[in-house]
């Protein structure tokens, strides 16, 4: 592989044991790949302090390990956004790898992403972000069912499929575009897709957690999904208005059918149609203003000066600590 400066960005919250194990896996997985990455953990306001001796051991591949400490807990996606801006402003590189600290993003798959990154450059697309498309998930059945339901709802409301997560390789020229995309504050992958930044994906199976259990539950999945929907706010609002318009047509047809049936002396069916039309009408009266408020709120937010990651993310950085090599 060609010589390059590679940064590995890893957000973490109270997951120090897994993060420490991940460093060893990174060092071993990349030992024969001519990669000497610099690792940057983003400490998302952990309530548990970094344990003594974290990353305090010799590495053969890793060039350095730093911990970017945030002033407060922001959440996984926003920690990634702060990390992206920090790397752009302070660590100019050829490629930035974004991955999670729990081990489900396997270090052994980084060379596959880098190889696709190189292939994109050879094909004349050097600015393409390369995502890992999840070919297989290992979570429990209930979570997989909820996730499948989320994917269906996401497709219906946004028109885009949920294909990728955080695990990716970002060229520096694409990073320069992402740091001015406000939506990365809510959802990294959705922001990339919505902003039309060039990207591609390759199928990669999800790994197992190194230690402990996944913190992703129904509430966390719901919040994660809502963050993605917010990125598509205008599209979601427009699709809801279309759905309401179709429902209004059905309402009119039901009323017309009820009147027609009434005059053909089938009163029981007419009464049933009237009840259905009344219930649907009440629901529509509540849905119409909600959809209109959503659409105009999103459109109005484009006029006002909003959150700009490049300008605002540095406010959340507390300090940077070098943990390897020790001073």
Model-derived segments and spans:
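Acceptor/aglycone-binding surface of glycosyltransferases and processive sugar-polymer synthases
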Residues: 70-72, 76-86, 104-186, 208-209, ...
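Short beta-strand/loop segment that forms part of the nucleotide-sugar
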Residues: 35-46, 68
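Short, well-formed alpha-helical segments that are part of the catalytic scaffolds
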Residues: 15-30
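Membrane-embedded multi-pass helical conduit in multi-pass membrane proteins
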Residues: 238-324
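Short beta-strand-to-loop acidic/aromatic patch adjacent to the donor-nucleotide binding site
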Residues: 92-104
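Catalytic donor/gating beta->alpha subdomain of glycosyltransferases that bind UDP-sugars
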Residues: 176-236
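A conserved acidic beta->alpha catalytic loop
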Residues: 43-52, 103-104
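Cell-envelope/extracellular polymer assembly enzymes that use nucleotide-activated donors
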Residues: 5-7, 38
